[in-house]
Regions:
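Activity-critical C-terminal alpha-helical subdomain
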Residues: 55-173
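Charged/polar, solvent-exposed surface patches and flexible loops
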Residues: 9, 35-39, 114-117, 134, ...
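Generic hydrophobic secondary-structure signal
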Residues: 10, 53-54, 90, 97-102, ...
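Generic structural motif recognizing short loop/turn segments at the entrances and edges of beta-strands
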Residues: 18-22, 119-122, 200
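Conserved helicase/translocase motor-coupling segment
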Residues: 2-89, 94
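Terminal low-complexity/disordered tails
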Residues: 150, 161-211
Length: 211
């Protein structure tokens, strides 16, 4: 939800919101990758038109270069499966036509290659290996408006950002039921400022837009 709001606010500032349909998966990144990615790579429309913007803490920095694969590696299902895990940070199953003798190896290899190509072309990450809640709390508005709460922590981190938001919600609304309202407000205020995070998200959006 927070990532969706950040991306939509930046799109709005760039006058590009009408070109995108931003959706978020409430199950989190791992569910998104393990459940939906196998479907994405089976449809040309999804492969060409669906892009993933994932929380920065999921970024693995894995570099996939198809040209550097040896013939042996290309035909090794265990190796290719491990490449997929190194890229995405999670195990993603290859769904193949089974039978008494199990799935077809060539089909499995093709799916792993599709996963890796999709990773290279269509998967993007929020900047600085940050989760969206951390990005929002690093805004000047948040630091000034909620200084007393934020200063209770030594630093804003991926580990404590959601708890800080919960504390702010309790201070503002008396409970944690309004975290989404708080996120929407913070995303709006954050988008009005200039920051390196915002600049990197603009670059990410432009890269997707050109595709």
């Amino acid at each position: 939800f927070a990532a969706k709001n950040i991306v939509e606010q930046v799109l709005g500032r760039m006058n590009k919101l009408q070109y995108f349909d931003v959706e978020f998966n409430p199950g989190g990144e791992k569910t998104l990758l393990t459940k939906y990615l196998p479907t994405f790579i089976t449809h040309d429309f999804f492969k060409q038109k669906v892009f993933l913007v994932i929380d920065g803490d999921m970024q693995t920095d894995y570099i996939y270069d198809e040209d550097k694969l040896t013939v042996t590696q290309e035909k090794d299902t265990v190796y290719m499966k491990e490449c997929v895990k190194k890229a995405y940070g999670v195990d993603i199953k290859a769904y193949v036509d089974g039978g008494k003798n199990g799935g077809r190896k060539d089909q499995e290899l093709k799916i792993y290659r599709e996963y890796l190509n999709y990773y290279q072309n269509s998967v993007f990450y929020l900047p600085n290996k940050s989760i969206p809640e951390k990005i929002l709390l690093e805004s000047q508005y948040a630091k000034e408006q909620y200084k007393d709460i934020i200063d209770l922590e030594k630093n804003i981190t991926n580990e404590n950002a959601k708890n800080i938001l919960a504390t702010i919600s309790e201070a503002d609304y008396g409970n944690t039921d309004h975290i989404n309202d708080l996120i929407q407000k913070l995303a709006y205020k954050w988008s009005m400022e200039e920051s390196s995070n915002k600049k990197m998200i603009e670059e990410l959006i432009n890269e997707i837009y050109k595709k």
